[in-house]
Design a protein with these regions (language model features):
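Conserved glycine-rich beta-strand-loop-beta hairpin in the small C-terminal domain of fold type I
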Residues: 277, 294-304, 316-329, 339
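Glycine-centered flexible beta-alpha turn that most often forms the glycine-rich phosphate-binding loop
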Residues: 203
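N-terminal small-domain helix-loop-helix segment of the aminotransferase-like
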Residues: 10-100, 107, 281-282, 349, ...
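Conserved core of the PLP fold type I
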Residues: 61-197, 207-225, 296, 376, ...
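Conserved core segment of the aminotransferase class I/II
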Residues: 224-294
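PLP-dependent enzyme catalytic core of the Aspartate aminotransferase-like
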Residues: 1, 345, 358-394
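Short hydrophobic/aromatic beta-strand micro-patches
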Residues: 248, 327-329, 369-371
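Short, conserved charged micro-motifs
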Residues: 334-339, 376-380
Protein backbone atom coordinates (compact mmCIF):
# COMPACT_ATOMS: atom_id res chain seq x y z
CA UNK A 1 0.00 0.00 0.00
CA UNK A 2 1.46 3.34 -1.09
CA UNK A 3 0.77 5.99 1.54
CA UNK A 4 1.09 9.56 0.25
CA UNK A 5 2.15 12.22 2.71
CA UNK A 6 1.65 15.96 2.31
CA UNK A 7 4.24 18.12 0.57
CA UNK A 8 5.16 20.01 3.79
CA UNK A 9 5.80 16.73 5.61
CA UNK A 10 7.81 15.30 2.72
CA UNK A 11 9.87 18.50 2.66
CA UNK A 12 10.98 18.07 6.29
CA UNK A 13 14.66 17.18 6.29
CA UNK A 14 16.16 14.80 8.80
CA UNK A 15 18.13 16.75 11.37
CA UNK A 16 20.97 15.12 13.22
CA UNK A 17 20.32 17.48 16.11
CA UNK A 18 18.00 14.80 17.46
CA UNK A 19 20.80 12.25 17.20
CA UNK A 20 23.10 14.58 19.11
CA UNK A 21 20.50 15.05 21.84
CA UNK A 22 20.21 11.29 22.22
CA UNK A 23 23.96 11.02 22.67
CA UNK A 24 24.15 13.75 25.27
CA UNK A 25 21.29 12.24 27.27
CA UNK A 26 23.78 9.77 28.72
CA UNK A 27 23.84 10.14 32.52
CA UNK A 28 27.59 10.87 32.70
CA UNK A 29 27.54 13.47 29.92
CA UNK A 30 28.06 17.15 30.77
CA UNK A 31 25.61 18.84 28.44
CA UNK A 32 25.81 22.48 27.43
CA UNK A 33 23.54 21.66 24.49
CA UNK A 34 20.00 22.21 25.72
CA UNK A 35 18.12 25.45 26.12
CA UNK A 36 16.17 24.19 29.11
CA UNK A 37 15.44 26.11 32.30
CA UNK A 38 16.91 24.66 35.48
CA UNK A 39 14.44 22.30 37.15
CA UNK A 40 15.32 23.71 40.57
CA UNK A 41 13.90 27.05 39.37
CA UNK A 42 10.36 25.67 39.04
CA UNK A 43 8.05 26.87 41.88
CA UNK A 44 6.65 23.38 42.42
CA UNK A 45 5.24 23.87 45.93
CA UNK A 46 3.60 27.15 44.97
CA UNK A 47 2.13 25.53 41.84
CA UNK A 48 0.72 22.77 44.04
CA UNK A 49 -1.02 25.38 46.21
CA UNK A 50 -2.28 27.30 43.17
CA UNK A 51 -3.68 24.07 41.74
CA UNK A 52 -5.53 23.37 44.98
CA UNK A 53 -7.01 26.88 44.91
CA UNK A 54 -8.25 26.35 41.36
CA UNK A 55 -9.80 22.97 42.10
CA UNK A 56 -11.33 24.20 45.36
CA UNK A 57 -12.81 27.15 43.48
CA UNK A 58 -14.60 26.93 40.14
CA UNK A 59 -13.25 23.51 39.16
CA UNK A 60 -15.92 23.00 36.53
CA UNK A 61 -14.83 26.05 34.53
CA UNK A 62 -11.16 25.11 34.91
CA UNK A 63 -11.78 21.62 33.54
CA UNK A 64 -14.14 22.73 30.76
CA UNK A 65 -13.36 23.95 27.25
CA UNK A 66 -12.27 27.58 27.20
CA UNK A 67 -12.27 30.59 24.86
CA UNK A 68 -9.86 30.48 21.94
CA UNK A 69 -8.34 33.85 22.84
CA UNK A 70 -7.46 32.52 26.28
CA UNK A 71 -8.46 33.07 29.90
CA UNK A 72 -9.31 36.76 30.20
CA UNK A 73 -7.70 37.46 33.62
CA UNK A 74 -4.44 35.90 32.40
CA UNK A 75 -4.52 38.03 29.25
CA UNK A 76 -4.99 41.10 31.43
CA UNK A 77 -2.06 40.11 33.66
CA UNK A 78 0.21 39.60 30.66
CA UNK A 79 -0.70 42.98 29.16
CA UNK A 80 -0.04 44.78 32.45
CA UNK A 81 3.32 43.08 32.92
CA UNK A 82 4.45 43.84 29.36
CA UNK A 83 3.44 47.47 29.83
CA UNK A 84 5.58 47.65 32.98
CA UNK A 85 8.63 45.72 31.79
CA UNK A 86 8.99 46.54 28.07
CA UNK A 87 6.96 49.77 27.91
CA UNK A 88 4.11 48.60 25.67
CA UNK A 89 0.57 50.00 25.83
CA UNK A 90 -1.40 46.78 25.59
CA UNK A 91 -4.76 45.67 26.96
CA UNK A 92 -6.22 42.17 27.05
CA UNK A 93 -7.53 42.82 23.54
CA UNK A 94 -3.95 42.71 22.27
CA UNK A 95 -3.23 39.27 23.78
CA UNK A 96 -3.91 35.72 22.55
CA UNK A 97 -2.75 32.75 24.65
CA UNK A 98 -0.85 30.02 22.79
CA UNK A 99 0.45 26.53 23.58
CA UNK A 100 3.93 27.88 24.18
CA UNK A 101 5.58 30.48 21.97
CA UNK A 102 6.48 27.71 19.51
CA UNK A 103 2.82 27.55 18.49
CA UNK A 104 2.92 31.31 18.11
CA UNK A 105 5.70 30.98 15.55
CA UNK A 106 3.65 28.48 13.55
CA UNK A 107 0.51 30.62 13.74
CA UNK A 108 2.21 33.84 12.68
CA UNK A 109 3.90 32.22 9.71
CA UNK A 110 0.54 30.77 8.64
CA UNK A 111 -1.05 34.19 9.13
CA UNK A 112 1.28 36.07 6.79
CA UNK A 113 3.00 33.56 4.50
CA UNK A 114 2.25 31.19 1.65
CA UNK A 115 4.52 28.56 0.15
CA UNK A 116 7.47 30.23 -1.58
CA UNK A 117 7.17 33.56 0.24
CA UNK A 118 10.27 35.26 1.65
CA UNK A 119 11.02 35.59 5.36
CA UNK A 120 13.94 37.62 6.70
CA UNK A 121 15.81 36.15 9.68
CA UNK A 122 18.92 37.04 11.62
CA UNK A 123 22.18 35.28 10.79
CA UNK A 124 22.30 33.08 12.86
CA UNK A 125 18.72 32.57 14.05
CA UNK A 126 16.67 30.45 16.46
CA UNK A 127 16.48 26.91 15.09
CA UNK A 128 12.92 26.39 16.38
CA UNK A 129 11.71 29.31 14.28
CA UNK A 130 13.48 27.99 11.20
CA UNK A 131 11.87 24.56 11.59
CA UNK A 132 8.43 26.05 12.29
CA UNK A 133 8.57 28.28 9.21
CA UNK A 134 9.81 25.39 7.08
CA UNK A 135 6.39 23.76 7.51
CA UNK A 136 4.95 26.60 5.43
CA UNK A 137 7.75 26.05 2.90
CA UNK A 138 8.95 29.64 2.83
CA UNK A 139 12.26 30.95 1.48
CA UNK A 140 14.73 32.53 3.88
CA UNK A 141 17.01 35.53 3.50
CA UNK A 142 19.58 35.92 6.29
CA UNK A 143 20.53 39.39 7.53
CA UNK A 144 23.87 39.64 9.37
CA UNK A 145 24.33 41.53 12.61
CA UNK A 146 27.16 43.49 14.18
CA UNK A 147 26.66 42.91 17.91
CA UNK A 148 24.10 45.72 18.18
CA UNK A 149 21.36 44.10 16.09
CA UNK A 150 20.64 43.64 12.40
CA UNK A 151 22.85 45.72 10.11
CA UNK A 152 20.38 48.29 8.82
CA UNK A 153 21.98 48.73 5.39
CA UNK A 154 21.69 44.96 4.82
CA UNK A 155 18.08 45.01 5.99
CA UNK A 156 17.19 47.80 3.58
CA UNK A 157 18.96 46.05 0.71
CA UNK A 158 16.98 42.85 1.34
CA UNK A 159 13.67 44.72 1.54
CA UNK A 160 14.43 46.52 -1.73
CA UNK A 161 15.49 43.30 -3.46
CA UNK A 162 12.89 40.79 -2.25
CA UNK A 163 9.12 40.74 -1.81
CA UNK A 164 9.37 40.14 1.95
CA UNK A 165 6.26 38.90 3.76
CA UNK A 166 7.63 38.58 7.30
CA UNK A 167 10.66 39.41 9.47
CA UNK A 168 11.66 37.29 12.48
CA UNK A 169 14.03 38.55 15.18
CA UNK A 170 15.01 38.02 18.82
CA UNK A 171 16.01 41.41 20.24
CA UNK A 172 16.95 40.38 23.79
CA UNK A 173 19.66 37.79 24.57
CA UNK A 174 19.24 36.17 21.19
CA UNK A 175 19.27 32.44 20.69
CA UNK A 176 21.95 31.37 19.80
CA UNK A 177 24.29 34.36 20.16
CA UNK A 178 23.12 35.92 23.43
CA UNK A 179 23.33 39.37 21.80
CA UNK A 180 20.91 42.17 22.71
CA UNK A 181 19.87 44.88 20.27
CA UNK A 182 20.64 48.43 21.37
CA UNK A 183 17.84 50.94 21.85
CA UNK A 184 19.16 52.94 18.89
CA UNK A 185 19.21 49.91 16.60
CA UNK A 186 15.63 49.05 17.53
CA UNK A 187 14.51 52.54 16.53
CA UNK A 188 16.47 52.43 13.25
CA UNK A 189 15.08 48.99 12.45
CA UNK A 190 11.46 50.04 12.93
CA UNK A 191 11.96 53.20 10.89
CA UNK A 192 12.94 51.04 7.90
CA UNK A 193 10.31 48.37 8.55
CA UNK A 194 7.53 50.94 8.83
CA UNK A 195 8.63 52.37 5.49
CA UNK A 196 8.22 48.98 3.78
CA UNK A 197 5.21 47.92 5.90
CA UNK A 198 6.35 44.36 6.62
CA UNK A 199 5.04 42.47 9.69
CA UNK A 200 7.64 41.64 12.34
CA UNK A 201 7.80 38.83 14.88
CA UNK A 202 9.67 40.03 17.96
CA UNK A 203 10.37 36.82 19.89
CA UNK A 204 11.17 37.53 23.54
CA UNK A 205 11.43 34.32 25.59
CA UNK A 206 14.43 35.49 27.64
CA UNK A 207 13.77 39.21 28.04
CA UNK A 208 13.06 39.15 31.79
CA UNK A 209 16.28 37.24 32.49
CA UNK A 210 18.53 40.31 32.52
CA UNK A 211 21.58 40.05 34.79
CA UNK A 212 22.83 43.62 34.50
CA UNK A 213 21.71 46.85 32.92
CA UNK A 214 18.15 48.01 32.34
CA UNK A 215 15.26 46.42 30.49
CA UNK A 216 14.98 47.76 26.96
CA UNK A 217 11.68 48.71 25.31
CA UNK A 218 9.83 46.45 22.91
CA UNK A 219 9.93 47.26 19.22
CA UNK A 220 6.29 48.31 19.57
CA UNK A 221 7.58 51.48 21.26
CA UNK A 222 9.00 52.55 17.88
CA UNK A 223 6.26 50.99 15.72
CA UNK A 224 4.08 53.64 14.04
CA UNK A 225 2.07 51.24 11.85
CA UNK A 226 1.19 48.39 14.26
CA UNK A 227 3.38 45.88 12.43
CA UNK A 228 5.01 44.17 15.43
CA UNK A 229 3.78 40.86 16.83
CA UNK A 230 5.48 40.15 20.17
CA UNK A 231 5.90 36.56 21.31
CA UNK A 232 6.18 35.75 25.02
CA UNK A 233 6.28 32.64 27.16
CA UNK A 234 6.04 31.41 30.74
CA UNK A 235 8.42 28.55 29.95
CA UNK A 236 11.55 30.34 31.19
CA UNK A 237 10.03 32.16 34.18
CA UNK A 238 7.36 29.72 35.40
CA UNK A 239 7.38 26.17 34.01
CA UNK A 240 7.63 24.88 30.42
CA UNK A 241 5.43 21.89 31.21
CA UNK A 242 2.40 24.21 31.32
CA UNK A 243 2.94 25.06 27.63
CA UNK A 244 1.81 28.66 28.03
CA UNK A 245 2.85 31.45 25.71
CA UNK A 246 1.20 34.42 24.06
CA UNK A 247 1.09 36.66 21.02
CA UNK A 248 0.72 40.40 21.58
CA UNK A 249 -0.34 42.37 18.52
CA UNK A 250 -2.81 44.89 17.12
CA UNK A 251 -6.51 43.91 17.34
CA UNK A 252 -6.82 43.11 13.61
CA UNK A 253 -3.96 40.60 13.81
CA UNK A 254 -5.42 39.14 17.01
CA UNK A 255 -8.82 38.74 15.34
CA UNK A 256 -7.27 36.76 12.47
CA UNK A 257 -5.10 34.73 14.86
CA UNK A 258 -8.19 33.89 16.89
CA UNK A 259 -9.73 32.31 13.79
CA UNK A 260 -6.55 30.31 13.25
CA UNK A 261 -6.51 29.19 16.87
CA UNK A 262 -10.13 28.02 16.72
CA UNK A 263 -9.33 25.85 13.73
CA UNK A 264 -6.03 24.50 15.07
CA UNK A 265 -6.79 23.30 18.61
CA UNK A 266 -9.86 25.23 19.89
CA UNK A 267 -7.91 26.77 22.78
CA UNK A 268 -4.88 26.50 25.02
CA UNK A 269 -5.57 24.27 28.05
CA UNK A 270 -7.91 26.26 30.35
CA UNK A 271 -6.69 24.40 33.43
CA UNK A 272 -3.06 25.41 32.83
CA UNK A 273 -4.10 29.01 32.24
CA UNK A 274 -6.13 29.22 35.44
CA UNK A 275 -3.40 27.64 37.57
CA UNK A 276 -0.86 30.08 36.14
CA UNK A 277 -3.09 33.11 36.73
CA UNK A 278 -3.89 31.93 40.27
CA UNK A 279 -0.17 31.58 40.93
CA UNK A 280 0.44 35.10 39.58
CA UNK A 281 -2.22 36.53 41.89
CA UNK A 282 -1.18 34.67 45.04
CA UNK A 283 2.61 34.58 44.85
CA UNK A 284 5.42 37.04 44.14
CA UNK A 285 6.31 36.73 40.46
CA UNK A 286 8.93 39.49 40.65
CA UNK A 287 10.73 37.78 43.53
CA UNK A 288 10.59 34.47 41.67
CA UNK A 289 12.16 36.01 38.56
CA UNK A 290 14.87 37.58 40.71
CA UNK A 291 15.70 34.18 42.19
CA UNK A 292 16.09 32.76 38.67
CA UNK A 293 18.28 35.71 37.69
CA UNK A 294 20.52 35.13 40.71
CA UNK A 295 20.89 31.43 39.85
CA UNK A 296 21.60 31.92 36.15
CA UNK A 297 23.89 34.91 36.62
CA UNK A 298 26.21 32.89 38.84
CA UNK A 299 26.27 30.12 36.23
CA UNK A 300 26.86 32.53 33.36
CA UNK A 301 29.70 34.13 35.30
CA UNK A 302 31.21 30.72 36.03
CA UNK A 303 31.11 29.78 32.35
CA UNK A 304 32.57 33.09 31.16
CA UNK A 305 35.35 32.85 33.74
CA UNK A 306 36.17 29.28 32.73
CA UNK A 307 36.14 30.15 29.02
CA UNK A 308 38.45 33.10 29.56
CA UNK A 309 40.75 30.94 31.68
CA UNK A 310 40.88 27.76 29.60
CA UNK A 311 39.92 28.43 25.96
CA UNK A 312 42.74 29.25 23.53
CA UNK A 313 42.86 32.90 22.54
CA UNK A 314 42.00 32.02 18.93
CA UNK A 315 38.47 31.12 20.05
CA UNK A 316 36.23 34.14 20.63
CA UNK A 317 32.82 34.36 22.26
CA UNK A 318 29.95 36.68 23.15
CA UNK A 319 29.35 38.18 26.61
CA UNK A 320 25.56 38.02 27.14
CA UNK A 321 23.92 40.41 29.60
CA UNK A 322 21.15 37.87 30.18
CA UNK A 323 19.38 34.86 28.72
CA UNK A 324 20.79 31.35 28.50
CA UNK A 325 23.45 31.22 25.79
CA UNK A 326 27.05 32.00 24.81
CA UNK A 327 28.10 31.86 21.14
CA UNK A 328 31.64 30.78 20.30
CA UNK A 329 33.58 31.36 17.09
CA UNK A 330 36.39 29.02 16.08
CA UNK A 331 39.24 29.76 13.70
CA UNK A 332 37.97 29.10 10.17
CA UNK A 333 40.07 25.97 9.68
CA UNK A 334 38.18 24.20 12.49
CA UNK A 335 34.72 22.70 12.13
CA UNK A 336 32.48 22.68 15.18
CA UNK A 337 31.01 19.30 14.26
CA UNK A 338 34.47 17.71 14.30
CA UNK A 339 35.19 19.32 17.66
CA UNK A 340 31.86 18.06 18.99
CA UNK A 341 32.65 14.46 18.05
CA UNK A 342 35.87 14.64 20.03
CA UNK A 343 34.15 16.37 22.95
CA UNK A 344 31.47 13.68 23.13
CA UNK A 345 34.26 11.13 23.60
CA UNK A 346 35.24 13.17 26.67
CA UNK A 347 31.64 13.28 27.89
CA UNK A 348 30.87 16.93 27.18
CA UNK A 349 28.59 18.36 24.50
CA UNK A 350 27.30 21.55 22.87
CA UNK A 351 25.19 22.40 19.82
CA UNK A 352 27.14 22.95 16.58
CA UNK A 353 26.34 25.79 14.23
CA UNK A 354 24.49 24.34 11.25
CA UNK A 355 21.03 24.20 12.87
CA UNK A 356 21.06 27.99 13.39
CA UNK A 357 21.61 28.94 9.75
CA UNK A 358 19.42 28.67 6.66
CA UNK A 359 22.45 28.93 4.36
CA UNK A 360 25.40 26.60 3.82
CA UNK A 361 29.02 27.07 4.80
CA UNK A 362 28.68 28.12 8.44
CA UNK A 363 30.82 25.51 10.16
CA UNK A 364 33.04 27.18 12.75
CA UNK A 365 30.57 28.23 15.45
CA UNK A 366 28.90 26.57 18.43
CA UNK A 367 26.41 27.42 21.17
CA UNK A 368 26.88 26.86 24.89
CA UNK A 369 24.08 26.83 27.47
CA UNK A 370 24.79 27.52 31.15
CA UNK A 371 21.39 27.26 32.86
CA UNK A 372 21.29 23.55 33.71
CA UNK A 373 24.65 22.80 35.36
CA UNK A 374 26.14 23.92 38.66
CA UNK A 375 29.30 26.02 38.71
CA UNK A 376 31.70 23.16 39.40
CA UNK A 377 30.26 21.09 36.54
CA UNK A 378 30.43 24.10 34.21
CA UNK A 379 34.11 24.58 35.00
CA UNK A 380 34.84 20.89 34.45
CA UNK A 381 32.97 20.79 31.14
CA UNK A 382 34.58 23.94 29.76
CA UNK A 383 38.02 22.60 30.63
CA UNK A 384 37.25 19.40 28.69
CA UNK A 385 36.19 21.41 25.63
CA UNK A 386 39.28 23.58 25.98
CA UNK A 387 41.55 20.53 25.96
CA UNK A 388 40.02 19.40 22.65
CA UNK A 389 40.35 22.89 21.16
CA UNK A 390 44.00 23.16 22.15
CA UNK A 391 44.78 19.76 20.63
CA UNK A 392 43.20 20.84 17.34
CA UNK A 393 45.07 24.14 17.26
CA UNK A 394 48.55 22.69 17.74
Amino acid sequence: MAIRFSDPVNAIKHSDTGDILKLIAQPDMISFAGGLPAEESFPAEEIKKATELVLNGDAGKALQYGPSLGYEPLRESIAKRMNRIVKTQYTKDNILITCGSQQGLDMLCRLFCNKGDTVLVEKPSYLGAITAFNLTQVNFVEIPGDGKGMIISELRKALETHDVRLIYIVTDFQNPTGITWTRERRAEFMEVVDEFEVPVIEDNPYGELRYEGEYLPSLTTFDTKNLVCSLGTFSKTFAPGFRLGWIAANPLFIEKLDLLKQNMDLSTAPFSQRVCETWLQNFDFDAHVQSIIKLYKSRRDAMLKAIDEFFPKEVTHTYPEGGLFIWCTLPEQLKSRDILKQCIERKVAFVPDEAFFTSEGNTNFFRLNYSCNDEATIRDGIQRIADVLKENLK
